[in-house]
From Swiss-Prot:
UniProt GO cellular component terms: cell cortex of cell tip; fungal-type vacuole; plasma membrane
Name assigned to this protein: Protein ECM7
Gene source species: Saccharomyces cerevisiae (strain ATCC 204508 / S288c) (Baker's yeast)
Compartments reported by the entry: Membrane
Cited Pfam families: SUR7
Family annotation (InterPro entries): SUR7/Rim9-like_fungi (IPR009571), SUR7_domain (IPR052413)
Gene (name only): ECM7
Induction of its expression: Repressed by zinc.
Organismal lineage: Eukaryota, Fungi, Dikarya, Ascomycota, Saccharomycotina
């Protein structure tokens, strides 16, 4: 019994829906659940899997940096040493050897790549294994496995690539990359101000993303409540209120979700552009995280579909011409306003107003032209009138004060119109378009 009630309660929001309403319901439910799932993957995922769900990655392979740094230093030294003494020949072999050894020593402890997440970064280095060559000599070779050191800062974390290079001991790269730009101190101050503003913007956008996910959870609750009561009450005020609340929330989620998604993408694209412009010559490369950004764009697409499924359908497509006030619809249960009136009003209304004439059909006209039909009608009316007079006489003997008036209801039909009016009065209610026996559907087809 208890399990049956639980099953009925769970299945209730999915009952009494048309085929189109079921499609809309599953579209709304599916997009809502996916938005919540993707939102949690975007925000909570980097805490548990920072190496997988990262926003960006800075490749710092030692071989690439060695080549890039060596090229930059060689060009710089050739320009500075290209004088009349060496006839512009450039560096000697010994100088090139010294320069190569110097660059290798500078990047000895640099990680192979750095992954940047929402809350921090991970420095990853390939592990080294000792192997023997064919002559029996032991060498250190990089293994395919990596060793990562992760740090979590918080929601206001932003990848400061200059600070990272300085912490890794790559001061030589900073000197050669930024000492040619006017005053180095002025450039550093402008860079610090710019990164501080980006950090503040990124923190605000992340908080907005949290709010969007929270609103989506509220939408899930209101949606279940709405389908739980849909079409089960004569007063649809609560039902329509829930629809408009969810439509408004979907619009807020759409605006906030797009702002947060575009802003996070813009911050990462900005940093990528600056790094590739300033450090690409030194062997650095900056890439965006494929998995995390795929989730981000799917999240943005789903909130757009959800907004169309709620706000679009309810405010742009649905037939909302029906009044959803506190009263019951005039046509509910087949009653039409002004057709059935009070007895007092009937007494004050003329006979022709209460029973308006209608055009007789060809069959009825032919029937009334038949003299036998009219004779039968008159005969029947006379019999009814005599029976009523006898009843009045009997009542007068039993109770002298009793006085029952026929009120003109059983008078003979003098004209064809009176016969037709009598026929109208005794017609079946099934002939009316507003019959009480028709099937009642409180919700219309275009109200989702």
């Amino acid at each position: 019994m208890v399990m049956s009630r639980i099953r009925d309660t769970i299945a209730r929001p999915f009952q009494n829906l048309t085929a189109l309403e079921k499609v809309v319901q599953w579209l709304r439910l599916g997009t809502t659940l996916l938005i919540i799932s993707f939102g949690l993957a975007l925000t909570v995922g980097p805490l548990s899997s920072p190496r997988t769900l990262y926003m960006s990655r800075l490749d710092t392979y030692s071989a690439d940096i060695t080549t890039g740094l060596f090229t930059v230093l060689r060009e710089s030294m050739e320009q500075s040493t290209s004088t009349e003494e060496n006839n512009g020949v450039g560096l000697t072999t010994s100088e090139l050897y010294i320069l190569t050894a110097y660059t290798e020593s500078q990047i000895k402890n640099v990680p192979q790549y750095i992954t940047v997440s929402l809350y921090g970064r991970c420095d990853s280095t390939y592990t080294m294994v000792e192997v023997f060559d064919s002559e029996g000599n032991m060498h250190s070779v990089k293994n395919s496995t990596t060793k990562s050191t992760c740090s979590s800062i918080g929601t206001d974390y932003l990848f400061d690539y200059r600070e990272v290079l300085e912490s890794l001991g790559l001061d030589i790269i900073l000197d050669y990359a930024y000492n040619k730009i006017g005053s180095q101190q002025a450039e550093s101050s402008a860079y610090t101000t710019y990164m501080r503003s980006l950090k503040h913007k990124k923190a605000n956008v992340l908080h907005l993303l949290y709010a969007v996910i929270s609103f989506q959870v509220c939408m899930l609750f209101f949606m279940i409540w709405y389908y739980y009561i849909k079409g089960r009450f004569m007063n649809a005020l609560k039902e329509r209120a829930l629809v408009h609340i969810n439509s408004l929330l979907s619009l807020v989620v759409f605006i906030g979700g797009l702002i947060s998604s575009i802003s996070l993408a813009w911050v990462n694209y900005t940093i990528q552009s600056r790094i590739n412009t300033e450090l690409e010559a030194f062997g650095f490369s900056y890439h965006l995280g494929v998995t995390w950004f795929a989730l981000l764009w799917c999240f943005a697409g789903l909130i757009s579909v959800s907004c169309l499924a709620w706000s679009g359908l309810e405010w742009c497509i649905s037939d909302n011409g029906t009044s959803y006030g506190g009263g019951i619809d005039d046509k509910f249960l087949g009653y039409q306003a002004g057709v059935f009136t009070d007895a007092d009003l009937d007494d004050e209304t003329s006979y022709s107003q209460r029973y308006p004439q209608r055009q007789s059909t060809s069959g009825e006209a032919e029937l009334m032209r038949n003299s036998d039909t009219m004779a039968t009608i008159r005969k029947t009316s006379d019999v009814d009138l005599n029976s009523e007079n006898d009843a009045n006489t009997s009542l007068d003997h039993g109770n002298p004060t009793a006085n029952i008036s026929n009120g003109g209801k059983h008078e003979p039909f003098a004209t064809r119109e009176e016969f037709e009016l009598q026929d109208i009065r005794f017609r079946s209610s099934n002939d009316s378009e507003e019959s009480m026996q028709r099937v009642i559907k409180p919700s219309s087809a275009l109200q989702f």
